[in-house]
Amino acid sequence: MVYKTQYHYTIGIIFMLCVGGLKGVGSQFLNVPGSVNEIKYGTQNALIYFPENRMGRSSLSVSHNDWYGDFSVISVGIASPIFGGQGLLRFKYGGFENLELRDEVPSDDPLSFYSAFGLDVAGGFQFQFNDIQTAVLLRMVQLRIHTHSSSGLSGNISMLKPINRDWKIGFSLAHFGFMDSYINEEPALPVSGNLLVEHRTVFQELQNTFSFSGGFIPSLDNYIFSANNAVLWRHLNLSLASHITKNVTHVSGSISFLIGMYQVQYGFQLGDNQLGISQVLELIVLLP
């Protein structure tokens, strides 16, 4: 039990702090998926928070993510038509509870207990103007580890424009904003500029959609490329994706099916970091 707790403690702290040192505080929590779409596409494209099958319909979503190292994430969101577009409000919470603080000497008695958590409150709006699909997302972030905390704002804006019947191209500016000082330094968010490409083909009842996003993250001296292919047949959707960064490659997949007013989604992600498999289960209720 002692060594299992120490393992979870190590994974949690490394996961939230050590990517780029303290300047990476917040970057990992922002990128932890809170929904199946985030595990499929990543978090660089704001448009993925506004799925097409919910345009014109209000919906309520609840999801649970078993992330690496028993880092548990819960997300609740509501989307609704507003001002000719679509509005979104979402809450995401993730963290560890009852972590044990220990010294370097092994012992059954911890020095103290504490928690590490992150809270992300996101609000956004999607609209279309002159064939340009635009999504804007603003996120308020609160992080706390032991007795230290940091809060800030993060924004995403994405635009996508058709260039012919099957292709769309656009760009996304992701995670720009600021964080309060954490301990003695001011953390930097993982700001990135990304190219977006989408190709869609339809054959009878089958629809195939290929999506690509790629960009550079200066604050982490890193890059991220994501490619996703999804096949839709009637009310069943299957997808497979690959996400590549400088140090880690992830593969993710999902299955989604719609039954009446209920949409059930399952997604998974695994990588060559050998931390296990992340799994997300999500229920979406389409409201009248």
Identify the function of each model-found stretch.
Residues 1-2, 17:
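Accessible peptide chain termini
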Residues 2-11:
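Bacterial N-terminal signal peptides that target proteins for export
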Residues 11-19:
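Bacterial N-terminal signal peptides
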Residues 20-288:
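Subset of outer-membrane beta-barrel
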